[in-house]
From Swiss-Prot:
Belongs to the complex I subunit 3 family. The lineage of its organism: Eukaryota, Metazoa, Ecdysozoa, Nematoda, Chromadorea. It is an enzyme of class 7 (translocase). Pfam families: Oxidored_q4. This is NADH-ubiquinone oxidoreductase chain 3. It comes from the Eukaryota. It comes from Caenorhabditis elegans. It is a multi-pass membrane protein.
């Protein structure tokens, strides 16, 4: 247990040190080239800041969340019998979330 605690403390110290070094040594240039969008070497045409639809962002977010939940299911299914209660609770929670998204119309793929 002591070794695990030492590894955790060492990892956190190393993480903080790398973050601090990155913050101190990075170049903070906010020129025109830094804040503009890069489109394969061509000059951008039009307003770039609102170039994506929030609908696709929400769909991506739901995909990532459900994908992570499926990965958690795989870990629960290979464990012992006592974890099936946790599996059923998580499954009911995910089905409830899926039903709410369907009810509010968030699963429509049409723009």
């Amino acid at each position: 247990m002591l070794v695990l605690l030492m590894v955790l403390v060492f990892t956190l110290v190393l993480l903080f040190a790398f973050y601090l070094i990155n913050f101190l040594l990075s170049i903070k240039d906010m020129g025109k080239n830094k804040i503009s969008a890069f489109e394969c070497g061509f000059v951008s045409v039009g307003k770039i800041q609102n170039s994506f639809s929030i609908h696709f962002f929400i769909m991506m977010l739901m995909f990532v969340i459900f994908d992570l939940e499926i990965v958690m299911f795989l870990g629960i299914l290979v464990s012992d019998l006592s974890s099936y209660i946790s599996f059923l609770m998580m499954f009911i929670f995910i089905l409830g979330g899926f039903y709410m998204e369907w009810w509010y119309g968030k699963l429509v793929w049409v723009i």
